[in-house]
């Protein structure tokens, strides 16, 4: 009973941290590592920005250019991992997710400031070679903005502390009932 309550507290803390990352732009979980399976078959990691999180449904959203590698990779294999780390709290969340949908929302795109719209309006595809940073051309009429939506299937919570690190795993198939695992 004691450990079950402790596990519930850890899961609630994970949700609280993710919600805080949406509210507070300086929260460490705002930027996180997204890892997909590359088209060649190996891991492909990059930093992305958390744009949405629903603590009841365990769904997440990010924005990207629809021509990016991550979109191609997720279309081939919808599994991915998110790695969140807070250096001050010594807290890590490793979240296994599946892509559940993508939305090309003109409304969300138009709500962005021009400086943010640039991230989705380059005429060159992401990853293509250019001479220099000034050689990027933009076409604001032709945005490639897309919102990717994910559903969590597993969460690992790791808190580095003394005398004992805390590590727990929660899985959708167990109705998010967690278990402690060796750190």
Describe every region a protein language model picked out.
Residues 5-57:
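An N-terminal domain-cap segment
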Residues 37, 65, 85, 151-153:
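Structured loops at beta-to-helix junctions and adjacent beta-edge loops in soluble globular domains
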Residues 43-44, 73-76, 160-163:
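Short glycine/proline-enriched turns and hinge-like loops at secondary-structure junctions
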Residues 91-183:
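Charged, gly/pro-rich active-site loop segments
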